[in-house]
Amino acid sequence: MKNKEKDMKWTTLDSEYLFRRPWLTARKDRVRLPNGHVIEEYYVLEYPDWINVIAITPDDKFVFVRQYRYALGKTVNEIVAGVCEEGEDPLETAKRELMEETGYGGGEWTKTATLSPNASAMSNLTHCYIARGVELTGGRSLDEGEDLEVC
């Protein structure tokens, strides 16, 4: 049996960074497919890995955050999510983000999946967790740009 990953791998012929920012980097690549076809402009968005957490209290209530999302132009309810710091274990990121955004901690944690948010254009992964039995254990510690409510 052939190694399908090797057969399907694209070759990068050239790569140019269009811009680099702390939360987003855009790159334009020139690539060759295994069949020889060359794509002159293939755009890639480089992001750090993310986490998201479905948090459930001992009395089976879900912990959400509510905040305004500029890109959507509206206020929405969300599960806890955040960016993995460089070198940080995704589970530790998830626990840190849950505590920082909601004040909830503890519980039993299970990793449910590692997914690509958009494999055709984004370089990062999303690490998904369920935290059962979380309790309000500490104070929140929001980043300067965060204004959210726990619901």
Regions found by a protein language model. Name each.
Residues 1-21:
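Extreme N-terminal tail/first-helix region
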Residues 2, 7-9, 42-47, 52-96, ...:
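Conserved Nudix-box catalytic region and its N-terminal flanking loop in Nudix hydrolases
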Residues 11, 105-112:
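A short coil-to-beta-strand element that immediately follows conserved catalytic motifs
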Residues 14-52, 58:
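Acidic, metal-coordinating catalytic segment for phosphate/diphosphate chemistry
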Residues 15-18, 113-118:
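Short, solvent-exposed loop/turn elements at beta->coil junctions and helix N-caps
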Residues 27-35, 118-138, 151:
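Active-site-adjacent beta-strand/loop module that shapes the phosphate/pyrophosphate-binding cleft
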Residues 88-93, 101-108:
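Beta-rich strand-turn-strand
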